[in-house]
């Protein structure tokens, strides 16, 4: 539980499971159930120590994490790469650095303004390309070096500042998104 608290997840601990037997492939991992309409359809298990692989996933293909929690919230839908970001800021996660056509359909079915928040690293650049392909807005928050994603930003700046910085950094113009992507690529 100390790991979850250190990542700013204290208020969300009830959403996680911990492998109490501490052996096998789930040793030293927190387990996050994946649901669709309240039914478990898979899980992701994240290591809490320095070991590879960082994640184990078992879920339906093209799954979009956290849709059950965003259906009745906000007028926008924040799309992240990682589950932790999605939980902390009530968004969804594609759990990779791309968005499949099937995931795009699921995201669009939420009926919200879509804002993609890529990780600030090289793989995040690929997510920007997919956002452009699907006509989504992209957020380019100005966080300090070493702050790779929204979870890192929450730990450094707090939840409110992180959310405001995301919402105040949204670009909808494809030309401006391309320019900001080039600037970002020079810094990652």
Task: List PLM regions with ranges.
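TOPRIM metal-binding catalytic domain and adjacent DNA-binding surface shared by DnaG-type primases
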Residues: 1-37, 71-72, 108, 167-188
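Phosphate-handling DNA/RNA-contact segment within nucleic-acid enzymes
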Residues: 6, 22-113, 127-128
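Generic detector of well-ordered alpha-helical packing
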Residues: 82, 86, 120, 150-153
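Active-site-adjacent alpha-helix of alpha/beta-hydrolase-fold enzymes
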Residues: 127-136
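A generic structural motif
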Residues: 137-148
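Short, surface-exposed amphipathic charged segments that create phosphate/polyanion-binding patches used
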Residues: 29, 108-112, 148-162
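Acidic beta-strand-to-loop metal/phosphate-binding motif
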Residues: 79, 112-123, 142
């Amino acid at each position: 539980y100390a790991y979850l608290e250190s990542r700013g997840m204290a208020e969300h601990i009830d959403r996680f499971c911990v492998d109490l037997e501490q052996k096998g492939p789930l040793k030293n991992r927190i387990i996050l159930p994946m649901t669709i309409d309240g039914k478990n359809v898979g899980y992701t298990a994240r290591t809490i120590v320095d070991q590879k692989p960082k994640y184990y996933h078992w879920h339906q293909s093209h799954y979009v994490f956290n849709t059950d929690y965003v259906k009745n919230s906000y007028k926008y839908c924040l799309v992240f790469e990682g589950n932790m970001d999605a939980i902390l800021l009530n968004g969804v996660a594609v759990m990779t650095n791309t968005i499949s056509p099937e995931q795009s359909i699921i995201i669009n079915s939420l009926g919200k303004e879509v804002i993609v928040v890529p990780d600030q690293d090289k793989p995040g650049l690929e997510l920007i390309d997919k956002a452009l392909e699907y006509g989504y807005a992209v957020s380019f928050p100005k966080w300090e070096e070493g702050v790779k994603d929204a979870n890192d930003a929450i730990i450094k700046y707090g939840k409110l500042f992180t959310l405001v910085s995301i919402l105040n950094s949204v670009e909808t113009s494809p030309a401006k998104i391309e320019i900001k992507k080039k600037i970002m690529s020079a810094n990652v």
